[in-house]
UniProtKB/Swiss-Prot annotation:
CDD domains (alphabetical): HisRS-like_core (cd00773)
Catalyzed chemical reaction(s): tRNA(His) + L-histidine + ATP = L-histidyl-tRNA(His) + AMP + diphosphate + H(+)
SUBUNIT field: Homodimer.
Gene Ontology annotations of biological process type: histidyl-tRNA aminoacylation
Protein name: Histidine--tRNA ligase
Family: Belongs to the class-II aminoacyl-tRNA synthetase family.
Record keyword Zinc present: no
Native organism taxonomy: Bacteria, Pseudomonadati, Pseudomonadota, Alphaproteobacteria, Rickettsiales
């Protein structure tokens, strides 16, 4: 194999040791909190039929630009999942799950984007979906779940909740007319993407990060001016619920989310510490998605959190167990070391023994200089059923009877 192929594919990253422990800590914490809220863990394949994701919307960047599509050997159109929600909806429908139901999932997703800090082509998400409730209380519960995760990661004071309400269909229809009327005056000044969206999905322009678009949007009509009474009441209940939980928020009427299936409540938890990739958790309602994919009409709300972005923010150091290294001296001691290592590991002791053909005791001790405890034994120790236990931090060394070794080590590693 060519040397230049022995590297990570652009937009992907190997995870080793401490960084992987950070990921696992976040995922484990999320699953623990999910369980408190009554979520069931599920796992879906990373490949799905392409049609599963086309319901994301033909105007979304994910569908038009970012999906990894290919034909398998049977000629089927297959896609590496770019997000979880559509795959979870597919699972809900195909398994005929009883609603209401809350589903938790996590794992890698894939998007063909320009790689940059905290934005890779393969990245990891924790994902929460709640199917079967059209109550604003469900929205409050899901947002509070996000806040719960951030609080336990000690990030709640460094992240801002931005929330918007897209309204009911009557609200959206009325708002689109006035928004398009306003934007048509500046059509030639809009970015290329926004000129295209003006025709197919004008609401997506509100989410533009283009400087020229942002300037134009400053004086654009606000969707809140077109809320029906039902929309006003629903949004008020959501905000009252957040106030009741003392969860601070900022209303941002430009949040529409990047996927076409969102409706009513949409939200993002953002930070100023990650540059342009400022969204850490994002989600909202998608009451029409299940029906559009062939299921029954099912109200739903969900969100996803980027593990890489959370990992970049948290202050976490994996507490590694104390390492115990074996240094057998001689062939008989080496044979005994195999048995000793196995027995200690079965009792929960972390034993490191990689050098099966040791050199001198001096060299082996030098190699073990950065470890915690060393067990030394040769012919003399085998005959007396003892082991030399050396604390590499203090230099203390003592002979310990084999029958007392486990208790001795457990006392040292606590």
């Amino acid at each position: 194999m060519q040397h230049n192929k022995l590297r990570e594919v652009r937009g992907t990253k190997d995870l080793l040791d401490d960084e992987l422990y950070r990921f696992q800590y976040i995922q484990h914490l999320a699953q623990t909190i999910a369980s408190r809220y009554g979520f069931i863990p599920v796992d879906t394949p990373i490949i799905e039929f392409t049609e599963v994701f086309t319901k994301l919307g033909n105007t979304s960047d994910i569908v038009t630009k970012e999906m990894y599509n290919f034909k398998d050997k049977a000629g089927e159109d297959i896609t590496l999942r770019p997000e979880f929600t559509s795959a979870i909806v597919r699972l809900l429908i195909s398994k005929n799950l009883t609603i209401p139901v809350k589903l938790f999932s996590s794992g890698p997703v894939f998007r063909y984007e320009r790689p940059q800090k905290c934005r890779q082509r393969q990245f990891h998400q924790i994902n929460f979906e709640f199917f079967g409730s059209d109550s604003p209380i469900a929205d409050v519960e899901m947002i509070s779940l996000c806040y719960n995760i951030l609080s336990e990661l000690k990030l709640s004071d460094r992240i801002k909740l931005e929330i918007n309400f897209l309204g009911d269909q009557e609200t959206i229809n009325s708002y689109k007319i006035h928004l398009v009327e306003y934007l048509n005056k500046y059509q030639k000044d809009l970015s290329e993407d926004s000129q295209r969206r003006l025709v197919v999905n004008p609401l997506r322009i509100l989410d533009s990060k283009s400087p020229e678009d942002c300037k134009i949007l400053l004086n654009a009509p606000s969707i809140s001016d077109f809320y029906t009474q039902n929309s006003q009441n629903f949004f008020k209940e959501v905000l009252d619920g957040l106030d009741n939980l003392s969860i601070n928020y900022v209303i941002n009427h430009n949040i529409v989310r990047g996927l076409d299936y969102y409706c009513k409540t949409v939200f993002e938890f953002t930070t100023s510490e990650l540059g342009s990739q400022n969204s850490v958790i994002a989600g909202g309602r998608y009451d029409g998605l299940v029906k559009s994919m062939g299921g029954h009409s099912t109200p739903a709300i969900g969100f996803a959190a980027g593990v890489e972005r959370l990992s970049a923010l948290i202050d976490y150091e994996h507490k590694k167990p104390k390492r115990i290294v074996l240094i057998p001296i001689g062939d008989d001691a080496t044979s005994y070391a195999i048995k000793l290592a196995y027995e200690l590991r079965c009792k929960g002791i972390h034993v490191c023994w990689n050098n099966y053909r040791g050199t001198s005791l001096k060299n082996e001790l030098r190699k073990a200089n950065d470890t915690d405890i060393v067990l030394i034994f040769g012919d003399e120790e085998l005959q007396s059923n003892t082991v030399k236990v050396k604390d590499m931090k203090t230099g203390d060394q003592q002979n310990v009877a084999v029958c007392d070794l486990l208790d001795n080590l457990l006392h040292r590693i606590v």
